[in-house]
Each structure stands twice: as C-alpha cells, then as structure tokens.
C-alpha cells in the first residue's frame, strides 16, 4: 500500500508531535529550514495515521495512493 503524506506548511507550527508519535519517526520525518516537519521518505509509512491524529492544527493529510499497473498504457493506441 502506497501512501502520500501532505503537510500544510501554513498550518504546521513545528511542534514535532508527528515525529514523536510516529513509530518510524526518524525514517519518515525531517525538519525544513523553518523548523517545520515534513515527510521525506514515505516508503516506511504503514498508514497508522498517528501523526495526523496528534497534529494540533490538522496540518497533516494522509492519502492512500493506488500504484499504476505496469500494463495500463500498453493497450492504449
């Protein structure tokens, strides 16, 4: 299952709760130059949504992304 973690940087206050509560915290989350967190490697995310649930400003959205099939474009001419 592939996921996309979207952080609204306008809403993020840089509290670090997403990082702290995430079972894979250091593998997924990092800070930008303004001290706000973002997900830089979602490969390790298993969609527990702890980060979104703990965010005090609701700045985190997690979307399940369906991977494209390899043969999806082969039959189109």
Curated annotation (Swiss-Prot):
MF (Gene Ontology): 4 iron, 4 sulfur cluster binding; metal ion binding; oxidoreductase activity
Alphabetically ordered keywords of this record: 4Fe-4S, Electron transport, Iron, Iron-sulfur, Metal-binding, Repeat, Transport
Coiled-coil residues: none
Superkingdom: Archaea
Record bears the keyword Cell wall biogenesis/degradation: no
Span of domain 4Fe-4S ferredoxin-type: 3-32, 36-65
InterPro entries found in the cross-reference section: 4Fe4S_Fe-S-bd (IPR017896), 4Fe4S_Fe_S_CS (IPR017900)
Residues engaged in binding [4Fe-4S] cluster 2: 45, 48, 51, 55
Note accompanying the cofactor annotation: Binds 2 [4Fe-4S] clusters.
Cofactor(s) needed for function: [4Fe-4S] cluster
PROSITE patterns: 4FE4S_FER_1, 4FE4S_FER_2
Binding site for [4Fe-4S] cluster 1: 12, 15, 18, 22
PANTHER family from the UniProt entry: FERREDOXIN SUBUNIT OF PYRUVATE:FLAVODOXIN OXIDOREDUCTASE-RELATED (PTHR43122), IRON-SULFUR-BINDING PROTEIN (PTHR43122:SF1)
Function, as annotated: Ferredoxins are iron-sulfur proteins that transfer electrons probably in the CO-dehydrogenase complex.
Protein name (Swiss-Prot/TrEMBL): Uncharacterized ferredoxin MJ0722
Lineage, uppermost ranks: Archaea, Methanobacteriati, Methanobacteriota, Methanomada group, Methanococci
């Amino acid at each position: 299952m592939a996921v996309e973690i979207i952080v609204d940087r306008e809403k993020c206050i840089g509290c670090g709760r997403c990082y702290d509560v995430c079972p894979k915290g250091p593998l997924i989350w990092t800070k930008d130059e303004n001290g706000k967190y973002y997900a830089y490697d979602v490969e390790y995310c298993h969609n527990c949504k702890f980060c979104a649930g703990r965010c005090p400003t609701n700045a985190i959205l997690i979307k399940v992304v369906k991977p494209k099939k390899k043969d999806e474009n082969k039959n189109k001419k």
